[in-house]
Amino acid sequence: MYIAMNRFKVLKGSETDFENLWKNRDSKLHEMKGFRTFHLLRGPVNETEGYTLYASHTVWESEDDFIAWTKSQNFRDSHKNAGTGKVLTAGHPRFEGFSAIEGA
């Protein structure tokens, strides 16, 4: 099992727009081999720096399945409008990938 996460620093006041963007997107994940599940996670608010932390969380059967997704036409189609609208985040997302330890 492989878990892929992107962490986003969403500017305070932009949380609803950010969540709606994800809710209304045309996701192609379910069409991909090895895809198991997706969750958008809301984390803590950082009052000092003015953002709310979010993470997109996907679970895949393998890292190879995730990599195939990132190289697919479905990935390109799903991300074709990224960065074209109102600025909702402080900087680019931060990717983190994890392989599950079998038997742990």
Regions found by a protein language model. Name each.
Residues 41, 96-98:
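Solvent-exposed beta-strand sheet faces enriched in polar/charged residues
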Residues 3-8:
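Active-site-flanking beta-strand signature of metal-NTP-handling nucleotidyl enzymes
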Residues 10-18:
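Short, surface-exposed ligand-recognition loops at beta-strand->loop->(often short) alpha-helix junctions
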Residues 27-36, 51, 59-96:
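An amphipathic, aromatic/His-enriched active-site/gating alpha helix that lines ligand/cofactor pockets
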Residues 22, 26:
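Short amphipathic alpha-helical/adjacent loop interface patches that line ligand
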Residues 98-104:
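Short, low-order "capping/linker" segments at domain edges
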Residues 9, 41, 57-59:
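Short hydrophobic/aromatic beta-strand micro-patches
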Residues 44-49:
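Acidic pyrophosphate-coordinating catalytic loop
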